Amino acid sequence: MLYYLSLGSNLGEREKTLQQALTAIGQQAGNILRCSDFFYSQPWGFDSPNEFCNLCCAVDSHLLPLDMLACTQSIERQLGRTEKSENGHYADRPIDIDLIRVFDGNGEELSIVNSQLSIPHPLWQQRDFVRIPLEQIFQS
């Protein structure tokens, strides 16, 4: 499977945390094929003085989508992530890893919507911090 992931951090040493996340993804999830440059953005969906550092990557993996989700959530916890939100609202975080798009071995894009996962990510085209880094990967 080919996964397109979005990673972001707005707490601590953001770039270092993203590099650690990429290392963990490469060790635990699959082969990283391409990565975008860092993309800096203001928080989306909440107010914070902490700017985000984001990137996207393409990962070739044998993991099924729910297994990839579990793997990326485990990596988030390893890097200090606790809750996905505070009282149902977005909040500052040391790391966030989202599954954005997934393609099977035949190059067909998967569509999954259930209580755990929505692929393609329903908001990816509305978020410059995802859309622009993804475009960079697609152009390379």
What feature does the model see in each segment?
Residues 1-29, 36-42:
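N-terminal beta1-alpha1 ligand-phosphate binding loop
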Residues 7, 35, 55-57, 97-99:
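A structural signal for short, well-ordered beta-strand segments
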Residues 7-9, 61, 135:
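Short, structured patches in soluble enzyme cores that scaffold and shape functional sites
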Residues 31-32, 101:
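A SAM-dependent methyltransferase catalytic signature shared across enzymes that methylate proteins
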Residues 36-60:
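Short, charge-patterned binding micro-sites
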